[in-house]
């Protein structure tokens, strides 16, 4: 059964009430785990579970049962033009944490006129670009706080424990680019085009950019690295990877149907034909025998996970009234860029969350 866009939960509810209910279905977030937990078998001891290359994309219920397992994912981080980096006298291996990223970026910016390129692309805060920072960059502060505090659902309040780390990276972006930080609010910049033209070494974006960049920059000259922000132990960070594409198997189905479904899932992620289909349809899959999707950035994400680096989850999925929260954050960041106080950003981040949580949970 195929659900119309935005109607998956209602379609699933309807289908689960039928005599021939689906055996394989999607449980993509913690809210869905709460709703469908009774319908999910524990996948932990299944053969397909043993084929995972990481458990970073699995969802568990409050008792630790693996209710669903990720079958594909997307990632974002900092895309690096390795050719330009080398021209500036550096290698990727020189960047292992925020301190080294800062040192390299500031040196490139200092020599930008001589080199013919700068450190970072523009960080526009107009509607076309702001999500990269109010969503994806802000995620760094949300992820580490959520990791410390064990978030399983959206908290009513946040503390902003890692806001200084968010500031670290934002300052680095806006102070080491050829574009004046006072102009970022007005829009009109095209960071993707700047990167394609070789105007900057670093560009924060995701695996979805690969197809747009590959015609201008060769695979050998591109790599995605983690967003380092000055947190202890971050040299073992991976990319920011997430998904809402997670398989669950119906606990109310017959044992025979469950067995057939689990065998089919295993075939999809281990056989030559199955993994080829998965790579073509979904890109990166978190399984040991995954076929190469051809996307260099997805390979970078997988390599880091397989090396034992921790995944930086998409904690921004917890954001209450996401559009309103981000709009308030954009306004505060624009004020800060124009010489205002970081306290405004702190207020929008922390108090704004509490305000939007109340509004969303009346």
Report the location of each language-model feature:
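Extracytoplasmic "Venus flytrap"/periplasmic binding protein-like
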Residues: 1-55, 83-89, 96, 201-202
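A structural signal for short loop-to-beta-strand junctions that line the ligand-binding cleft
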Residues: 14-15, 22-23, 50-85, 116-118, ...
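Hinge/lid segment of periplasmic solute-binding proteins
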Residues: 28-80, 132, 138, 223-225
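Short, solvent-exposed loop/beta-turn-alpha elements that line the ligand-binding surface or hinge
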Residues: 44-55, 120, 124-127, 141-168, ...
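Extracytoplasmic/periplasmic solute-binding protein
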Residues: 67-71, 76, 102-155, 200
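Conserved C-terminal helix/tail region of periplasmic/extracytoplasmic solute-binding proteins
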Residues: 86, 110, 273, 292-293, ...
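Extracytoplasmic/periplasmic substrate-recognition and gating elements
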Residues: 88, 215-281
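Glycine-centered hinge/linker elements that transmit conformational signals in sensory
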Residues: 105-106, 151-185
